[in-house]
Every structure is written in structure tokens, then in C-alpha cells.
Amino acid sequence: TYNVIKDRIGKIGKKNLNFIRDEKIVIDNCVINNFEVMHDAEKCLGYTFEYEGKKLSYASDVGCVNNIIKENLKNSDVIVLESNYDYNMLMTGPYHWELKNRVKGRNGHLSNAEASKLIGQVLCEKLKKVYLMHISKDNNTPELAYNSLYQILERENKSHLEIEIINEEGTEIYKI
């Protein structure tokens, strides 16, 4: 991530660059855990934040779902997850074949179907809200991402669960 944004934020001294993997961090009773996600960039991590019995889980740049990701998203009150592309839009869209294969590959991104299936696998009574993010402008629409997840929730009798699409403007503050 730093390599991508360093031109915008300037140089950060090496002593201030700390990539902490597989370590729990506690800040004012908030427990922050990280977990590796499969992506073609270096050191991509997902995070869980736990405070006073509440849990928020965040995962983006997820090439494929594995048990580590599932275990970390389980028992969440809120999940923030990428829903990057619609398979049909990707395959018929403007990207060249190499990039299409990269996006849908094991080190690429989650499709709407894959993100929705993952949410279906980690559903629990605690889960109140799902934020869908990192939605491709070329290969997806917010409506397709939303509808894909809504179909899974409806099938599981969880259609009351809140779904929100995150765009560049961000979101309102959500209290768990």
C-alpha cells in the first residue's frame, strides 16, 4: 500500500514503517488482529477490531476465500468486504485477457458471487450490517453487488440485515 501512495504522502522513515503480522495489538482495550489475504501485492492484510464484546471485520484485495478469512469474519457484528466485480461484466468488459485473469485469479479480487457466498458462510445472529466496497467501476455496479448479497440473505431468512455500498465519499458513522 505504501508503495502505491508514497508519491502522494511523501517519504516515511524506515523506523516508522512497521508491518505487524500475526500479532495482536491492544489500544485502549480495543483488540486489533490481522490476517493474511491472497493478493498480488505485498503484505496484504485483513483486520478484526474487537471492543467490549463487539467485532468489526475488514477484508479487501481478497483473491480467494480460505479458512483463515472465514474464521476471522465469523462472529462479527459488522463486516466490511470487497465485492469487486460481476463475472459477466468482467468477461465482456474492456480489460485485456491477462488483466481479466489477474482480477478473477487466486491473487486477484472477489466477485459479487464469491463475496456473497462468504457472507452466507459466516452469517450469525450477531451480524447486523455488511458494507460492500472496492466495487470496480468498469466491471461492476453497486446494484449488482447489492442484489447478489441480498439474494443470499433472503435465502437464509436474513433479508433484514443492513447492506451498504461504500463509495469514494465514505459512510456515515455506524454505532455497533
Predicted regions and their residues:
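Active-site HxH/HxHxD metal-binding segment of metal-dependent hydrolases
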Residues: 1-24
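Alpha-helix N-cap/helix-start and coil->helix boundary motif
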Residues: 2, 86, 170-171
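A generic structural signal for alpha->beta connector loops
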Residues: 13-16, 29, 127, 160-162
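Beta-strand->loop->alpha-helix junctions that form or flank phosphate-binding loops
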Residues: 16-20, 158-169
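Core dinuclear metal-dependent hydrolase active-site scaffold
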Residues: 20-78, 174-176
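Cofactor-binding loop segments of dinucleotide-utilizing enzymes, especially the Rossmann-like FAD-
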Residues: 61, 135, 168
